[in-house]
UniProtKB/Swiss-Prot annotation:
Keyword check for Cytoplasm: yes
Example of a GO cellular component annotation carried by this entry: nucleus
Localisation per UniProt entry: Cytoplasm; Nucleus
GO biological process, one term: DNA recombination
Keywords from the named record: Cytoplasm, Nucleus
Protein name: Uncharacterized protein C409.16c
Length: 120
C-alpha cells in the first residue's frame, strides 16, 4: 500500500515545489510523460491564474509553482507519479518517489509531504 504522510494542513496559494524521482530498470518515455504532465499542470495554473515551471534532469522531474492552489498540484503530480495498483507498478517497471515542499508567505516553516511508493 502507498503511504502518505501529511505533517501540516495545506493552504491555498503557497509556494510549491514538487520533485518526482524515477527509479527505472528501463528508460522512461520522458517526453510523453512530460507532455501529459505539463498539459495537466498548465491547465491547473490557468484556472488558478498562477505560473508553473517544469524541469527535467536525468530521472528527476522538478515542478515549481507560484500562486497556485497547492492541493491541485499535489493531486496532479501524484496521479502521474504513483501507479494505481501493485500490478500496474510491476507492468510499468518504475518505482517513483514523490517529494513535495511548501513555503507559506506568513511563516518560514517548510511543510514536507512524502508519498512513498509500493514496497519492492
Amino acid at each position: 500500500m502507498c503511504s502518505v504522510e501529511k505533517i501540516v494542513r495545506l493552504r491555498h496559494n503557497l509556494l510549491c515545489h514538487v520533485r518526482i524521482h524515477f527509479k527505472t530498470k528501463e528508460d522512461l518515455d520522458i517526453r510523453a510523460f512530460l507532455f501529459s504532465l505539463q498539459r495537466e499542470l498548465h491547465a491547473v495554473a490557468f484556472l488558478n491564474q498562477g505560473s508553473i515551471r517544469t524541469l527535467y534532469e536525468k530521472r528527476v522531474v522538478d515542478i515549481t509553482s507560484e500562486s497556485v492552489q497547492s492541493h491541485a498540484i499535489i493531486e496532479t503530480a501524484r496521479n502521474f507519479a504513483l501507479p494505481n495498483t501493485a500490478e500496474e507498478e510491476e507492468n510499468m517497471d518504475r518505482k517513483p518517489e514523490l517529494q513535495l515542499s511548501f513555503k507559506g508567505s506568513m511563516t518560514s516553516k517548510i511543510i514536507h509531504i512524502y508519498v512513498q511508493p509500493f514496497d519492492s
